[in-house]
Amino acid sequence: MGYDVHTEKGFVNRGNLHRMKKLMRLARQGDRMTLAFLGGSITQGSVSSQYTNCYAYLVYDWFVRRFPKTAFTYVNAGVGGTTSQFGVSRVEEDVLAFKPDFVIIEFSVNDDNTDFYQETYEGLVRKVYGNQFAPAVLLVHNIFYDSGVSAEEKHREIGAHYQLPSVSMKPTVYAQV
């Protein structure tokens, strides 16, 4: 059984791609780079059959295969059942201490679609995006596949405000499930 996933539909905000372009230039140069992933159980890979099947590792593996001259460090700071409120309290130690060049943030399933979680998510995004090492940031919006519920609406507003690239599983993968 094959899936017909239209990846273009997943781009909900292209944002300012300056840092992404810089990331790709650095990756082509063959230096050392750190890729970090911050989120809940989806990022952690808790339901993956093996850790190499979780999205975070697959993204890391794509970079390794695409840029073989570059030595990549993989930082998976996914902790199941946690929200952006907990994420903002641990981001410095679990992510920023590694001086990441690229950070994916994913809390759309565990956060509620409320103003409170929009504030905690914004605090997290500001901490990462405003870091002195200026990492490229990608916001990933997942969804409860059984109900279609997520905090994507509130999180997308933050991504648009800071002009950050954002992708959504709702119009792509969720549409196929």
Predicted region positions:
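A short, flexible beta-alpha/helix-coil linker loop
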Residues: 41-44, 109-111
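N-terminal secretory targeting modules
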Residues: 1-37, 43-50, 64-70, 177
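Alpha-helical cap/lid subdomain in secreted, periplasmic
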Residues: 25, 31, 54-177
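Structural cue for short, hydrophobic secondary-structure segments
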Residues: 37-38, 106
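A secondary-structure boundary/capping signal
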Residues: 38-39, 169
